[in-house]
A protein has these predicted regions:
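Active-site or ligand-binding cleft "flap/edge" segments
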Residues: 50-51, 83, 100-104, 141, ...
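Conserved, well-structured core segments
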Residues: 60-63, 99-100, 179
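Gly/Thr-rich phosphate-binding beta-strand-loop-beta motif of the actin/hexokinase/Hsp70
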Residues: 1-2, 8, 100-127, 146
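Conserved phosphate-binding loops in N-terminal lobes of ATP-dependent enzymes
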Residues: 1-79, 88, 118, 129-131, ...
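Conserved phosphate-binding catalytic cores of ATP/NTP-utilizing and phosphoryl-transfer enzymes
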Residues: 72-74, 86-110, 126
Length: 186
């Protein structure tokens, strides 16, 4: 999400197209919502513009990180029921869904996102809570490290602003970096 001023904002493709001249703000930091007003705008954009749905007619499932604070879950539920008038809501942990997506109910899930990496042992679809671990390290940290390396070498990537440079490095990272399944062969 990009915020120009308090009354004008861009989300999604419009934000990407104008990223060189806009200030970028993410309402989620290290897996936790920090800006509820903008999260509400994002959900409105998703439900109305992207999905073209009638929220009153559909239950919603929301994924959440391992250690999502209960107060955040309650606040999000309040927004969904009171603002969007949804009939039902289900929260599920991303680690469990990641394992389900691979067709398994028992295993070990590693989920590395923008600001968090989470480790979760799962047995028959249930989290084994004594083994849960979360590290505040993710893709944004790798982007910042690559950006620092470029700055330390005197590189300037964008004539516009530092935010745009970060997005350029993020694009390079996403197109060039990968996780190998056969480390020894590489």
């Amino acid at each position: 999400m990009k915020v120009v001023n308090k009354t004008e904002f861009f989300i999604g493709d419009k934000a990407k197209k104008n990223r060189g001249v806009l200030n970028y703000f993410n309402p989620i930091k290290r897996g936790t919502i920090i800006d509820w007003d903008n999260i509400e705008k994002i959900y409105k954009f998703i439900l109305d513009d992207e999905l073209r749905s009638k929220p009153k007619e559909h239950n919603i499932m929301i994924t959440e990180p391992l250690m999502n604070p209960r107060k955040n879950r309650e606040k999000l539920a309040q927004i969904m029921f009171e603002t969007f008038n949804i009939p039902g809501l289900f929260f599920e942990n991303t680690a469990v869904l990641n394992l389900f997506a691979s067709g398994k109910f028992t295993g070990f899930s590693v989920d590395s996102g923008e600001g968090l990496t989470q480790y979760a042992p799962i047995f028959e679809g249930y989290l084994l809570t004594p083994g849960l671990m979360q590290v505040e390290f993710g893709g944004e940290d790798i982007t910042n490290f690559l950006l620092k390396m470029l700055f330390d070498n005197g590189e300037k990537l964008s004539p516009y602003n530092d935010n745009n440079e970060k997005k350029i490095v993020e694009d390079i990272k996403e197109k060039s970096c990968y996780v190998t399944l056969k480390f020894e062969d590489e």
